[in-house]
Curated annotation (Swiss-Prot):
Entry keywords, A to Z: S-adenosyl-L-methionine, Transferase
CDD domains, alphabetized: AdoMet_MTases
InterPro entries: CmoA (IPR005271), Methyltransf_25 (IPR041698), SAM-dependent_MTases_sf (IPR029063)
Organism: Shewanella woodyi (strain ATCC 51908 / MS32)
NCBIfam families documented for this protein: carboxy-S-adenosyl-L-methionine synthase CmoA (TIGR00740), PRK15451.1 (NF011995)
Official protein name in the record: Carboxy-S-adenosyl-L-methionine synthase
Residue numbers binding S-adenosyl-L-methionine: Y40, G65, C66, S67, D90, N91, D118, I119, N133, R200
Any GO BP: tRNA wobble uridine modification
Length: 243
């Protein structure tokens, strides 16, 4: 999955627009996310392992907010021939086009239906696994309960939702510490202070992270009885909920 180096915010911008998953971002996304999200590679790898354990024959897998298809590829490699279909959805046409190229580079018996659309409009049915990999944080907070409810209803008994997100923390000291560690991570990966500052400004109005408690409360309120935080590095985490 090739990608150019992310230099989107390397030059000073007079007016910083809100972050969007356009052609410019799609072209550098693989580099951007791996230099910005600690543990991203581990999360992607483990999605495949979870799929191997939980995806059942003749079911659907949903990758909601699929971007370049990293999660879909990891899942497809691990589930083998189970007569399943993966439905990979993103609202960015640029992401979908590049995802199609990435998927085409690997031969598999598992078909992938690529959908350019709003995940809030997608029907979830006969699902054994649903993935929201750093997606929900970009949804309007008022839309999140309804999405989780739809996912829960569309999952088969024993099916899983894997939810990866940046987290907020109620304890301001913990928030400050983990923010600082994350900034150090980005600096160590070659981002300048200008890039970090401008990227933060672009995300300010479009990314609204929840706390871990908010995620757990939402999932259990919609019916999930089993919930676990299986991965965390700094203020980035991945959770699994089982129906």
């Amino acid at each position: 999955m090739n990608s150019s180096q992310d230099t989107i915010y390397a030059q000073a911008c007079e007016n910083i627009s809100d972050f969007q998953f356009d052609e410019k971002v799609a072209g550098v996304f693989n580099d951007m996310i791996r230099r910005s999200v600690p543990g991203y590679g581990q999360i992607i790898q483990t999605l495949g392992e979870l799929a191997h354990k939980y995806v059942t024959p003749d079911s659907h897998v949903y990758d909601l907010g699929c971007s370049l298809g990293a999660a879909t590829l990891s899942i497809r490699r691990k589930i083998g021939s189970r007569n399943c279909t993966i439905i990979a959805v993103d609202n960015s046409q640029s992401m979908i086009e590049r995802c199609q190229e990435n998927l085409g580079a690997y031969v598999s018996d598992t078909p992938v239906d690529l959908v350019c659309g709003d995940i809030r409009d997608i029907k979830i049915e006969n699902a054994s696994m649903v993935v929201l990999n750093f997606t929900m944080q970009f949804l309007a907070p008022n839309d999140r309960d309804a999405l989780v409810n739809k996912i829960y209803k569309g999952l088969k008994p024993g099916g899983i939702l894997v939810l990866s997100e940046k987290l907020n923390f109620e304890d301001s000291s913990v928030q400050s510490l983990l923010d600082d560690l994350h900034l150090d991570f980005k600096r160590a990966n070659g981002y300048s202070e200008l890039e970090i500052s401008q990227k933060r400004s672009s995300l300010e109005h479009v990314m609204k992270p929840d706390t871990l408690a908010q995620h757990e409360m939402r999932l259990k309120a919609q019916g999930f009885t089993h919930f676990n935080l299986w991965f965390q590095c700094f203020n980035f985490a991945s959770m699994v909920a089982i129906k």
